[in-house]
């Protein structure tokens, strides 16, 4: 098994240098060439690339002062040109206003908004009084918090729960209206003649029997009220049920031979013969 661990020599060891690979086979480049005699494979060691952190840091920080023509210095010059053009395009007040607005938008709780100037002062080194005098909070800008919350306006008030941001009443009303507009409309019930007739009966203080006996209702209104009050399913099922003429039961129904009445048991049959049979 090949050893992938390289022994460290304390005399020549540099902790700032990292190697590309510790496997000697992985550091060799193998190529195959095909000619008339056959395939010839050649291998040569790959150049070992060392990354020294100390050299990279020194090159990074000294390239600006020396002004050499390497890639790092050109990148620094390009960045410096962009920064100069950015500073020339905007004033310091506009930059502070933009930073403050970005930090306020990044704040999760509205109660932490007064602490934004202090944090911005610690980051930029500009005094807090100067930040508060030259910039405006997000609630006072035209496209600030009101635009963020969909046009809702906030007012800082003192309530029984303490200081905080409170929505104005008209804003709450706008939110309720917008919520109602998103809800599906309720389906309207059709105003049929049956409902109108029933409402007339319920709104009147007269007795039902006196109302029906009077000549105010015609035959159509009576049919409408009856069909609305009674259960239609019950009348559809009831004629299909055969009951005993004595006890009203509906199990083991049989009929009398003489008169044809329905009987369910022997006792009902005896009682029927004694009292109700017409053809005895």
UniProtKB/Swiss-Prot annotation:
Tell me the residue numbers annotated for binding Zn(2+) 2. 256, 259, 272, 277
Renumbered to this chain, the Basic and acidic residues biased-composition regions fall at: 74-92
Which GO molecular function terms does the record list? Answer: nucleosome binding; zinc ion binding
Q: Which GO terms describe its cellular component?
A: chromatin; nucleus; Swr1 complex
Q: Which keywords label this protein?
A: Chromatin regulator, Metal-binding, Nucleus, Zinc, Zinc-finger
Quick one: where's region Disordered?
A: 64-92
Polar residues compositional bias, start-end? 64-73
Biological process (GO), any one: chromatin remodeling
Q: Where in the cell is it found?
A: Nucleus
**Zinc finger (HIT-type) stretch:** 244-277
In which residues is Zn(2+) 1 bound? Answer: 244, 247, 264, 268
PANTHER family, per database record: ZINC FINGER HIT DOMAIN CONTAINING PROTEIN 1
Subunit-level organization: Belongs to the SWR1 complex at least composed of ACT1, ARP4, RVB1, RVB2, ARP6, YAF9, VPS71, VPS72, SWC3, SWC4, SWC5, SWR1 and HTZ1.
Q: What is the role of the protein in this entry?
A: Participates in the catalytic exchange of histone H2A for the H2A variant HZT1, an euchromatin-specific factor, leading to chromatin remodeling and changes in transcription of targeted genes. Indirectly involved in vacuolar protein sorting.
The name of this protein is Vacuolar protein sorting-associated protein 71
Highest classification ranks of the organism = Eukaryota, Fungi, Dikarya, Ascomycota, Saccharomycotina
| Gene name for this UniProt entry | VPS71
